[in-house]
């Protein structure tokens, strides 16, 4: 029996786009500040989970909601289980969008919206692949279970809770990365660097009142703001002129304001996914490189000097001795993404590090402590820690997925590792598969995120063919 998978997708294009639009319109940024006992990760992620499960109920699948933090859509009765793993939460948005990030806009063949590429678009594509198999009543020998999490972009609380109470597949894929395949994922963790408060620190021409930047540990910060107390009014004009010259010659835009004995410096860079920080413009580290040339108070000078010297343009963690390289999994990446400094309070920087096999989290911690031993800091590992994950290229899952990719695209398939962390790493034999195609711009976690419409439909056909081959 020959199935024209692309034809089946084309027959469902309008339905797919409508469902995707309905899901995108839900602002599903994790929001524990407004969480409740019934919706612990916030109302948005819970609403998005319920919406996608509604699609499953409407289409005749078995569904299950686990405490509004995770759930699944299931089809088939086989003893073996094949897993699909997606997420309905999205990363925060900033003010640099050209359109409403939660109102899908189709322009020039692209669907612009937060979550269009990561991960609502690919998840809906994989869901429709599953639906096509059901609609065609194709014979299958395995149960297909599509598991949805609601805080993949942060601490994975939802999926961990799911794993505590539900049976997990041993094999499957997550539609949350790129083609041809991601069969290796680096270890991921964050290091919080806390600066000691120096008593009786000397004042400078300017005192650093605050330095703030960043939305999430896994996002390169798109804007940063420093507030300086002016101790020498004669220095302000030179500061302003130098700042204007600085933003003219660098990759950041800037704003300068003066009021009530203080100046406020704002830099605007470019947000990006922390797995590839080189594609962003880190507004905070750029701002630090400007401020480092000025005489600041003792606490402020120590903070700014450390950021400028050890964290600016250090995409691979070499300055902090966090670097290693693996033949298959590639190089370490490092990105300083959260900055929280107040003169009378905390003074912290959080770095997101993604490392291959060959170095451990404790090795990195010890190396960073040695490098920064004279900076008066303490360093701690915070949040969720993910270890490196690799499924060999010889695995039948990897071989089948690459075969399907090659047949649908005419392109050569090959194994690949990334610094991103997907739910694929949860499974013993789990990988990430699509939905971004080679040569496409990676706009995940960035303003004006988009998914090419044709790629969305092509990915759906690939998913349907691949899933069916693996469960028939």
What are these regions (language model features)?
Residues 1-83, 91-93, 350, 455:
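N-terminal helical capping/dimerization or prosegment-like subdomains
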Residues 8, 27, 344, 399-470:
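Zn-dependent metallopeptidase/amidohydrolase metal-coordination segment
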Residues 58, 81-148, 152-154, 447, ...:
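Active-site metal-coordination/substrate-binding segment of hydrolases
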Residues 107-108, 130-145, 238, 296-302, ...:
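Phosphate-handling active-site elements
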Residues 119-120, 124-198, 240, 315-328:
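Acidic/histidine-rich catalytic neighborhood of metal-dependent amide-processing enzymes
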Residues 184-186, 190-270, 274-333, 360-376:
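Acidic-enriched catalytic cores of C-N bond-cleaving enzymes acting on peptides and small amides
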Residues 223, 237-253, 388-426, 430:
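Active-site-adjacent substrate-binding region
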Residues 272, 306-313, 340, 350-357, ...:
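A short beta-alpha structural unit
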């Amino acid at each position: 029996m020959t199935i024209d998978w692309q034809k089946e997708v084309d027959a469902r294009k309008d339905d797919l786009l409508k469902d995707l639009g309905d899901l995108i319109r839900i602002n599903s940024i994790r929001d524990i500040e407004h969480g409740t006992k019934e919706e612990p990760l916030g109302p948005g992620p819970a609403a998005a989970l319920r919406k996608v499960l509604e699609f499953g109920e409407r289409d005749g699948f078995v569904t299950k909601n686990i405490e509004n933090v995770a759930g699944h859509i299931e089809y088939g009765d086989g003893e073996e289980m094949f897993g699909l793993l997606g997420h309905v939460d999205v990363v925060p948005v900033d003010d640099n969008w050209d359109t409403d990030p939660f109102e899908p806009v189709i322009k020039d063949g692209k669907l612009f919206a937060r979550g269009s590429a990561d991960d609502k678009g690919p998840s809906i594509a994989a869901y429709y692949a599953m639906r096509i198999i059901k609609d065609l009543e194709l014979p299958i020998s395995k149960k297909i279970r599509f598991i949805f999490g609601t805080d993949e972009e942060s601490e994975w609380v939802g999926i961990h809770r799911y794993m505590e109470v539900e049976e997990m597949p041993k094999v499957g894929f997550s539609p949350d990365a790129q083609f041809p395949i991601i069969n290796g994922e680096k270890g991921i963790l964050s290091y919080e660097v806390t600066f000691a408060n120096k008593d009786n620190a000397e004042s400078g021409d300017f005192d650093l009142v605050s330095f703030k930047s960043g939305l999430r540990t896994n996002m390169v910060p798109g804007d940063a703001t420093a507030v300086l107390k002016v101790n020498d009014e004669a220095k302000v004009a030179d500061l302003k002129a130098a700042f204007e010259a600085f933003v003219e010659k660098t990759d950041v835009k800037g704003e300068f304001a003066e009021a009530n004995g203080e100046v406020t410096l704002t830099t605007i860079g470019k947000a990006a996914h922390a797995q590839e920080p080189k594609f962003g413009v880190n507004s905070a580290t750029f701002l630090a490189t400007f401020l480092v040339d000025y005489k600041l108070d003792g606490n402020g000078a120590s903070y700014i000097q450390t950021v400028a010297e050890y964290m600016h343009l250090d995409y691979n963690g070499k300055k902090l001795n966090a670097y290693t390289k693996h033949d298959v999994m590639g190089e370490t990446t490092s990105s300083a993404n959260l900055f929280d400094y107040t003169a009378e309070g905390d003074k912290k920087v959080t770095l997101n590090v993604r490392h291959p096999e060959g170095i451990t989290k404790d090795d990195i911690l010890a190396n960073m402590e040695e490098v920064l031993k004279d900076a008066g800091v303490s360093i701690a590992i915070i949040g969720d820690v993910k270890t490196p994950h690799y499924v060999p290229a010889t695995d039948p899952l990897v071989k089948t997925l690459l075969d399907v990719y090659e047949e649908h695209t005419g392109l050569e398939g090959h194994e690949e590792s990334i610094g991103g962390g997907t739910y694929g790493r949860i499974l013993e034999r789990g990988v990430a598969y699509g939905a971004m195609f080679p040569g496409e711009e990676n706009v995940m976690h960035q303003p004006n995120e988009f998914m090419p419409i044709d790629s969305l439909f092509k990915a759906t056909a690939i998913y349907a063919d691949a899933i069916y081959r693996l469960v028939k």
